[in-house]
Amino acid sequence: MKVVNKHQLGYVGKDFFAKIPVLGKWATRIRCLYLKRGNTRNSLRIINEGVEYLNDGFSLLIFPEGTRSWSSEMGEFKAGSFKLATKARVPIVPITLNGGYHLYEDQEYIRKGQTIDVLVHPPIETADMSRQELAEVPKKVEAMIREGLEQLK
């Protein structure tokens, strides 16, 4: 299997995805990172590896809720989801998605013909932020996405 990753984009997801035939191999080849929930050692390794990727010019897609939504309600953000970007001091581009829950309404199969609305927010530059400002980034991003979700509804 040949994988072309022209835009150098990977994602951070649950280790479950690595076990899916074809998808797991493809995702690993484009440098996706897999988290094992409850495994601190794995989380630290992923943070260090992710920071390396970001410093090498890769972009990583992270879903800060840590899971898919089964409704239009936004879940709680995981505190660690911002550690990669704030540690690497790279820009964060918040993206609001609305309607993805329709894809899994029966929670078994992906439904075809569904629409997902996407709103890309302005980047948040972290390079010159103080520790205090970095600590406030998760709340700022969550507020932006929550506001974006209201716009898209």
Predicted regions located by residue number:
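Catalytic core of membrane glycerolipid acyltransferases/transacylases, capturing the structured
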Residues: 1-40
